Amino acid sequence: MAHLLILDALNLIRRIHSVQSKQHPDDVAAQLAATDITMQRAVNTILQEATPSHVIAVFDSEAPGWRKAKYAAYKEGRTAMPDALRQGLGQLQDSLLRLGIDSLVSETDEADDLIATLVKPLVANDHQVTLISTDKGFCQLLDSGLQIRDYFNKRWLDHAFVQQQYGLQPSQLVDFWALTGISGMNIKGVPGIGEKTAQQLLSEYGTLTQLLDADATDNKKLQLVQQHREVCLLAQELVRLKDDIPLGFNLKDLRYTPPA
């Protein structure tokens, strides 16, 4: 059985760079150098803990993807990557390569969809897949068998985490976010439906489809959801990860060979 380790690269790098930019506020070159060194240390620790047979780092594209084409306000207002870091990504990718880790960089697809595409066939064939990320959006993939490790908080984002955080099953998370929206992505949910109400509705009805089809007589919250059907369905589409992107390589290309 193979064990693929996936690094959500910018999720890791941007958090490291944020710390280093505070420690070297007036020196962008020092920020990048410190980010590079700290990233390498972090990745070495991750490799030692995970002991993978295969590994890849996945980077986001800067180009607008299908979500932006579908919904023009997608991720509006999000803090842009600092220019110095953007210009230094090639250096960081070279450092990863020296550690034995290739980088997947798409011109058109978001890292989240690329990761979901990597995960799907491997877990279906009983291979182990561990993702290093703090992004809770990946928890929608937990039922597939994916393991998610939050490196910074030293915790697993697993079924128990989802139950504690949301009171739901991983399979219900897409519908949960379709109701509440996701502010960090500027995805709108149903006005007046917060996390507690969304959890209650999904605990009772199971899925967004059942919520939209249910008899809403004498249930104002349900009426509210049904009045915002199109908002919910758009958010559901935007939140759900695509897992069918042609990648052009296979598992054997990702075999991890530690540097000599």
Curated annotation (Swiss-Prot):
Positions with a binding annotation for Mg(2+): D112
UniProt keyword annotations, A-Z: DNA-binding, Endonuclease, Hydrolase, Magnesium, Metal-binding, Nuclease, Potassium
Binding-site list for K(+): L179, V190, I193
NCBIfam families, sorted: PRK09482.1
UniProt domain 5'-3' exonuclease: residue ranges: 168-258
Gene3D superfamilies: 5' to 3' exonuclease, C-terminal subdomain, 5'-nuclease
GO terms for biological process, alphabetical: DNA replication, Okazaki fragment processing
Family of the protein in this entry: Belongs to the Xni family.
Pfam families with a match to the protein in the record: 5_3_exonuc, 5_3_exonuc_N
HAMAP family, per the entry: Xni (MF_01192)
Source species taxonomy: Bacteria, Pseudomonadati, Pseudomonadota, Gammaproteobacteria, Aeromonadales
GO molecular function terms attached to this record: 5'-3' exonuclease activity; 5'-flap endonuclease activity; DNA binding; magnesium ion binding; potassium ion binding
Protein name as it appears in the record: Flap endonuclease Xni
Annotated region (Interaction with DNA), positions in chain: 192-197
